[in-house]
Amino acid sequence: NSIHEFSWGLEQVDLATGFEQYTTALEMTLLPQNQQGKKQMLANRVSALLGGTSQEIQQVHQKMLNFYRFRSESLHDGNGSNITDTELKELENVTREVLKKCIERCKAEYQSNHTITWAEVKNLIMSDLVTQVTLLKNSGALPA
């Protein structure tokens, strides 16, 4: 699960492996299984979830696109040179903030429905993010 992937990322001494684990945790938390076009969708959803102002949304979006590129270069090309301690720490913090927001949502949903499952909460989160991303694209805060 997402928390396990995040925890495993915290335990890594290899920067690239930690980076990959954090990215996987984000994908597992915010994307449907076997989703195509993960990079853009993940960047959109993380920025919608964490950004407050238009500028913050754009900054988080660009950072996530860069992080995903670094992960791909490391995983597919064997080139992890862009992954530094700073980038790893930044992605760790992004992942932690996303997980915290999702846990808060779980607690809120559980208050009104004690039988709700993580899969159901995840679907609610993803549905809300689809709506939010559409609004942000329409306002120009995210690229269309």
PLM regions: where:
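Amphipathic, oligomerization/interface secondary-structure segments
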Residues: 1-144
